[in-house]
Design a protein with these regions (language model features):
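Residue-level hotspots within the lipid-embedded alpha helices of multi-pass solute transporters
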Residues: 25-29, 62, 102, 106, ...
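Helix-terminus/linker motif at the lipid-water interface of multi-pass membrane proteins
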Residues: 30-48, 117-126, 182-189, 247-276, ...
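Small-residue hotspots at the loop-to-helix junctions and early N-terminal turns
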Residues: 44-55, 132, 136, 195, ...
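Small-residue-rich hydrophobic transmembrane alpha-helices
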Residues: 47-107, 146-165, 257, 261, ...
Length: 448
């Protein structure tokens, strides 16, 4: 067990898996920041509008991304089991699942654009709503392309080849930034420019990932696209609970975002900017969470539960080290970092406080709340993670947000306190699940 030659993943193999994932996570966040920072030159109304739409998009995108995660778990376990043929068959089935869900939500977003925005954010200023509508219409068209990319990227990660999705993400982000420069600074079409850049980059990502899948010798995607109910059932076993968890979680975030919107533009902008900046601290931990699917999934597929626990502990230590190394400098330089967004004095004051608070909480509990949960999913323990996440979200993130933010008058600060209460509950319950060994209860559900 302790000899490296007997381990499924050497130290070098873990580094080769993790570094591309960290870079890709950075690039994904950079794309969102590029939209926000470059759109900031058009005014706070555009920034707020994009932020509100992004909250909806995260909900819709999260549903078909959950299908991709389900496929990734199944593919990783088959890879660990040494069955490459089943890896290929699983690939076909989850492309069908991801593609179908992505098309469905594109249609929903296009048809009910105004209705959704009015229902959720009917009390925002008119210029914010106008920017949100424009951005939403255009970005919705990109959903199927993003679904294709997410599906292909998840497959490459599941078999341990994370460099592919990193390279595609790099090219796509360069296209996005160039598009922003031309359409926002040059043509000056504000929210539409940011949305069009995102659309073009996602189309390119989808085309590139399809071409690379065709050339891959690790993933043999079949030309037969008939539904295989047995394999699809395994994907849905992971994907549906994950999707329900993700969607209900995002609904909760939408409710809190809607609550924040009622606190005024300063609170809305501070929330958007803090979320954007704070996400950089979470990059390594999020990347490790993605790697958990590959590493723990392959260990479980190979029947190596002791190795699964060993790698889980090892990767959590790395996640915490990264959180601390990034969090401390972000606290020290919080004000100059926030200064790049050209915020008003009132918004700046709120944003700096929220950023420092977020950094401290991330260093304490974030990896246990999120990265660790992917280990449970990779082992097939998806129902427990779903129940914990949904219950904690409603009780803490939503319930306490209204009590602290609105009831006690703490505003957006109260909402962030409630959010971190959610993190603490998740961290405690997931850690206890692993400590008792119950997370391995469904380890034979997928490949045996």
């Amino acid at each position: 067990m302790t000899e490296e030659k007997k381990m499924l993943f050497s130290q070098d193999a873990l580094k080769k898996l993790l570094w591309p994932l960290i870079i890709e996570q950075f690039l994904a966040i950079a794309m969102g920041m590029a939209d926000t920072v470059m759109a900031a030159s058009c005014g706070e109304a555009v920034v707020s509008g994009i932020s509100l739409v992004d909250s909806i998009c995260v909900l819709l995108i999260g549903l078909f991304t959950a299908m991709a995660s389900g496929g990734a778990v199944v593919a990783a376990q088959y890879m660990g089991h040494g069955d490459k043929e089943m890896v290929g068959r699983a690939s076909n089935q989850f492309f069908l699942a991801v593609g179908g869900v992505a098309l469905l939500f594109m249609m929903i977003a296009l048809i009910w654009n105004r209705g959704l925005l009015a229902l959720l954010y009917g009390n925002v200023e008119a210029d914010v709503m106008n920017a949100a509508r424009i951005y939403f219409y255009i970005v919705a068209v990109s959903f199927p392309f993003l679904g294709i990319y997410n599906g292909g990227a998840a497959l490459f990660r599941a078999v341990g080849d994370s460099k592919v999705s990193m390279k595609v993400s790099l090219v796509a982000n360069l296209v996005n930034i160039a598009g922003n420069a031309i359409l926002i600074y040059g043509v000056r079409i504000g929210a539409a420019g940011a949305a069009l850049s995102t659309l073009f980059s996602r189309i390119l990502s989808a085309v590139m990932i399809i071409v690379l899948l065709g050339k891959s010798d690790k993933i043999i995607v079949s030309n037969h696209w008939r539904i295989d109910t047995k394999i699809l059932g395994k994907i849905l076993y992971i994907g549906v609970p994950n999707g329900l968890e993700n969607s209900i979680f995002q609904i909760g975030k939408l409710l809190t975002t809607s609550l924040i919107a009622g606190f005024g533009m300063a609170a809305t902008t501070a929330n958007a900017v803090t979320g954007s900046i704070a996400s950089f601290q979470q990059i390594p931990a999020n990347a490790i969470g993605v790697a958990m699917i590959t590493v723990i999934g392959q260990c479980i597929g190979a029947g190596e539960t002791e190795q699964a626990l060993y790698y889980l502990k090892k990767m959590m230590k790395v996640a915490y080290a990264c959180m601390i190394l990034l969090g401390i400098p972000m606290i020290i330089f919080a004000r100059p970092i926030c200064g790049i967004y050209h915020l008003s004095p009132e918004t700046m004051k709120i944003t700096v406080f929220l950023l420092c608070y977020s950094c401290v909480c991330c260093m304490l509990v974030h990896p246990l709340s999120f990265a660790q949960s992917n280990a449970l999913r990779a082992a097939g323990d998806v129902r427990f993670t779903m129940i914990v996440a949904i219950a904690s979200m409603w009780l803490c993130r939503v319930g306490m947000a209204y009590i602290l933010g609105q009831g006690l008058g703490l505003g957006v600060i109260g909402v962030w306190i409630a959010m971190t209460m959610d993190w603490v509950v998740r961290a405690f319950l997931f850690t206890n699940r692993i400590r008792t060994g119950k997370w391995l209860k469904y380890k034979d559900r997928l490949v045996k």
